[in-house]
Design a protein with these regions (language model features):
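Divalent-metal coordination cores built from histidine and acidic residues
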Residues: 40-165
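Short acidic, glycine-rich surface-loop motifs adjacent to enzyme active sites
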Residues: 164-172
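Activation segment
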Residues: 4, 36-38, 56
Length: 173
């Protein structure tokens, strides 16, 4: 593969007549749940095989950008993904072992060190943002304090500055 100034120049070896046809240089999948899979099989061959060249992770308020977020017996990645994705906890526990970062910057940086198939963009997931600031139990049982809201705003602004595409929610009240 080549990029930018490395692209070859000159006459094409083959010209395809495209009149009346569609040209899709690559598809963008804005709603994936590949957050765990991208670290276990970063080439994401089933995605690329279908013509998708860019995926977004961190959808539906779930993701791994804050790291494992484990505290005592609480395991937010396993608990949250089990409910939404219906993935067995035994499988999710193995996925959590692949998480080696503990902040949003290191999460984005780790993509530079794995052999990605498609391009990957990320959202800050709202549920995991709440867990990061409030802990799992409090994040699902009470409203945040003003100080907690301010910390969430700070982390979200930091994430946007780092290159996150925005914040995802699950759409529930």
């Amino acid at each position: 593969a080549a990029r930018g100034s490395e692209l070859p120049v000159g006459e094409a070896a083959r010209v395809i007549e495209g009149a009346g046809q569609w040209l899709l240089p690559g598809l963008l999948d804005i709603h994936t749940h590949l957050d765990l899979e991208v670290d276990l099989e970063p080439g994401l061959p089933e995605v690329v095989r279908h013509g998708t060249t860019t995926v977004l992770v961190g959808n539906c308020s779930l993701g791994t950008c804050f790291g494992r977020q484990q505290s005592g017996a609480q395991n937010p990645i396993v608990d949250c993904f089990t409910r939404v994705e219906n993935i067995p906890k035994s499988v999710l526990n193995q996925c959590v072992e692949a998480v080696h970062w503990d902040n949003t910057g290191d999460y984005l940086d780790h993509f530079d060190n794995i052999p990605l198939g498609p391009n990957v963009g990320a959202f800050i997931p709202h549920s995991m943002l709440r867990v990061e600031v409030m802990g799992l139990t409090d994040s699902i049982s009470r409203a945040p304090t003003e100080a907690e809201l301010a910390r969430m705003e700070q982390l979200l602004e930091q994430g946007i500055a780092q290159g996150y595409q925005g914040m995802s929610t699950d759409g529930l009240p």
